[in-house]
Amino acid sequence: MKINKYIDHTLLKADSVQSQIDQLLSEAKTHEFASVCVNPGWVSYCAEALKGSDVKVCTVVGFPLGATTPETKAFETKNAIENGADEIDMVLNIGKLKQGDYQAVEDDVRAVVEASGDKLVKVIIEACLLTDDEKIKACQLSVAAGADFVKTSTGFSTGGATISDVKLMRQTVGPEIGVKAAGGARSLEDALAFIEAGATRIGTSAGVKIINGEAVKGGY
């Protein structure tokens, strides 16, 4: 198993500076990670730096709260793709989901899917804020709206990915839709356990340490 190809090498901190982004890019190219996941302001820089490599540029939309309008998320998506993004990790409207406004949630995801063209869309459901029934519904609505992946977490709320959430999400979406575990992998063993549970992508800021079998303290 090539664990590196499961990893979205991630740097989403507000205080990220260019030297840190450069390190992220260098590590991603060296270890041939699936993607780098960065804030939208870094997309064009990363896209230019990764030309000629297989590493994708992933960015975030409606991040981290999911509480912007569908129109705003669609604009963010189009702008990110114009700047060179290959993959979009969007946050669904969590409040609308919790109050049972399911059509609004589906329409919100669909707005991003339609704006994304042929680019990959991952829907962050922020599982730590949801009941199991809400997690199932969030996954079902994401699939109905045409998403390619469901993702556990932003890394900016009360918790990251858990094995039980990944299993539940995989059971809900079936074998054809991707599942991304984010914010919970602290070791190679963790990453392998998430993959065993059904994850097809791992979002982490510690990809290098994970593939080298080193322990990770803190971080995303």
From Swiss-Prot:
Pathway, per record:
Carbohydrate degradation; 2-deoxy-D-ribose 1-phosphate degradation; D-glyceraldehyde 3-phosphate and acetaldehyde from 2-deoxy-alpha-D-ribose 1-phosphate: step 2/2
Q: Which top class of enzyme applies to this chain?
A: lyase
UniProt key word ATP-binding: no
Per its record, what are the GO molecular function terms?
deoxyribose-phosphate aldolase activity
Domain of life the protein comes from: Bacteria
Q: What does the record give as the reaction this protein catalyses? A: 2-deoxy-D-ribose 5-phosphate = D-glyceraldehyde 3-phosphate + acetaldehyde
Q: Which Pfam families would you find in this protein's record? A: DeoC
Which InterPro entries does its entry note? Aldolase_TIM, DeoC, DeoC/FbaB/LacD_aldolase, DeoC_typeI
Enzyme Commission identifier(s): 4.1.2.4
Listed under GO cellular component are:
cytoplasm
Q: Where is the active site?
A: 89, 151, 180
Protein location: Cytoplasm
UniProt keyword terms in alphabetical order? Cytoplasm, Lyase, Schiff base
GO biological process: what's one of them? 2-deoxyribose 1-phosphate catabolic process
Q: What does this protein do?
A: Catalyzes a reversible aldol reaction between acetaldehyde and D-glyceraldehyde 3-phosphate to generate 2-deoxy-D-ribose 5-phosphate.
Instruction: Give the similarity note.
Output: Belongs to the DeoC/FbaB aldolase family. DeoC type 1 subfamily.
Q: Which NCBIfam families match?
A: deoC
> What is the official name of this protein in its record?
Deoxyribose-phosphate aldolase
| Species | Streptococcus uberis (strain ATCC BAA-854 / 0140J)
Source taxonomy: Bacteria, Bacillati, Bacillota, Bacilli, Lactobacillales
